[in-house]
Amino acid sequence: MSGKSIFDKLWDRHVITGDEGQPQLMYVDQHYIHEVTSPQAFQGLRDAGRKVRRPDLTFGTFDHNVPTVNIFDIRDAISKAQIDKLAENVIEFGIDNASHGSDKQGIVHMVGPETGRTQPGKFIVCGDSHTATHGAFGAIAFGIGTSEVEHVFATQTLWQVKPKKMLLEFTGKPQKGIYSKDYILALIAKYGVACGVGYVVEYRGEAIDRLTMEERMTICNMSIEFGSKMGIMNPDQTTYDYMRGRECVPEDFDAAVADWKTLVSDDDAEYDKVIRMDVSELAPMVTWGTNPSMGVDFDTPFPEVRDMNDERAYHYMGLRPGQKAEDINLGYIFIGSCTNARLSDLQLAARIVKGKKISPNLTAIVVPGSRPVKRAAEKIGLDKIFKDAGFEWREPGCSMCLGMNPDKVPDGVHCASTSNRNFEDRQGFGAKTHLCSPAMAAAAAISGHFVDVRRMPEVQ
């Protein structure tokens, strides 16, 4: 009998009833909510006369609609209604939360790990497609729809069909200037946005082992852009060191670690699909089109038109085959989002811009992903470095990742963005998004166009 993967072990721990291959009822350990996908679910509970079954396993955040200049100046009526309704709902149903304006406020996929609620072995859901972020800790974590949010509220369970398993092994040692964002963008560019459909992706290999937890979260975050709603990594000493001392970790932390160590994949675990990628061959990545697979490394020209999707993307972006990333005339820079707004991301960008000025006629903003990150960054002077360089230093929130709050890219303007999606109109009507690492975004802010960060002395 073959061994089990970490996913197998966690799945088996959480099955309540049902046969494999059919929908199985799964127990949910942690339910994260935010203001956009929860209002209808709460109303469904009221209409049925139900309560939240386990408010102690539910945690709320305010992030998508929150302004980042004056966080309480919410002028859009729908955004304000969603914020106000979540504030009412968490009180009515007795749910702990990182309230709007509190010292814990931030993006849901940052607040969970920061508070220690995200832990190895847990089954985690949230009404948000980037919930796979939490899989970096050795948890099953994925996004759900609003009707499923209501089901979890009412029962603390969810019906799911077990997905197939993919092993994705990152090998080799990267060149300087290559980061985990480049790993995942290169993977998606090579294999497409549908490769992971129907699979849980287990990321493994020496290149993963060397990453910090913040870098690992970046990779798991974009599992959904690879087509998989779940990404997972084996917990290790890096995981435990990150978690130790955080607010919500188990009181007997050493005993918890002893259990977590049993959850890693067995050497003889079997997978339905295996992909290997050598990161030593990677160059800095930039997207040119309107989905995350439309990307190239800095050394490679944009591809020829292969189909109608390419033709439409080139038309929307105002680009053409044969151009290169350095030819893009940038007008905006966005460093933020649940993909790349952690302290290490801001430190990396600050090293590059320190003592310099952003290019004229360019707008550049930095949005820490949470208030703890903002405080930590200010404590070591990162805010001053960015402001001296001409960046706007904002309050935490989802910000310019999506056009759901005041932070939008103007129509027709190209933006270098550390976020996760480059769809048409994602950052605002007519916005032209180019996904990249924090290093590439910071360097582009200074030059006004993309440059090869491998050549910069500030880059390690």
UniProtKB/Swiss-Prot annotation:
GO BP annotation list: L-leucine biosynthetic process
Binding residues for [4Fe-4S] cluster: C338, C398, C401
Disulfide bridge positions per record: none
Gene designation: leuC
The protein's name: 3-isopropylmalate dehydratase large subunit
Domain of life: Bacteria
One GO molecular-function entry: 4 iron, 4 sulfur cluster binding
Note on cofactor: Binds 1 [4Fe-4S] cluster per subunit.
